[in-house]
Amino acid sequence: MNATTAPLPYSAARLHELAQLLIGNIRELAQAGWTPATSSNFSHRLDEQHAAITVSGRDKGRLVEEDIMVVDFDGQPVGRPLRPSAETLLHTQLYRRFPEIGCVLHTHSPVQTIASRLYAGSGVIRLEGYELLKAFEGNTTHETAVDVPVFANTQDMQVLAAQVEALLDKQSMWGYLIEGHGLYAWGRNMAEARRHLEAFEFLLHCELELLKLRSPR
């Protein structure tokens, strides 16, 4: 007699839908050169207790549906015994804290990585006066400033998650950098998260170009 298979605690149909959404968008980001050497990780809220997230160590430009797994908001695998990204807690803490957040994107473009190294000492990059600041949800004017935190890199995700949590208590954030690493950005859905990600990429690139122009020759 075969053992009865326990039902999944989430919708398989919804997971399939989100896997296709993630794979298509991640492939475009990989083609842009933002996910080198299997780096980066991506997730989407699945329901009130689970998220769909990329499996660790997979080439982000060649993902298939089996490369998208499910975790609970404690970062534990659900359904299949696969290994999620080492940084899963940085995703799930956002879903746990903000019910409105539906998607979290983490990339490693050269611009993001270089900016994170240059501004690590100050711990923040101030973006001010740019028209594209209106790309961030809730911003309606260029006459404002957005502070992008730069956290020190660490392999201890509990420590980093606690640092992020402490800053979330103090300020509005659409994303942050990790030193020598890359950028996290999020939104209510994939479209908004990508808009925030692309806005950060553009604005950080502008800041790096301004630094070069202002440097004495």
From Swiss-Prot:
GO BP, sorted A to Z: L-methionine salvage from methylthioadenosine; monosaccharide metabolic process
A GO cellular component entry from the record: cytoplasm
One Pfam family named in its UniProt record: Aldolase_II
Binding note for cofactor: Binds 1 zinc ion per subunit.
Broad EC category: lyase
The protein's required cofactors: Zn(2+)
Gene3D superfamilies: Class II aldolase/adducin N-terminal domain
Name used for this protein in its record: Methylthioribulose-1-phosphate dehydratase
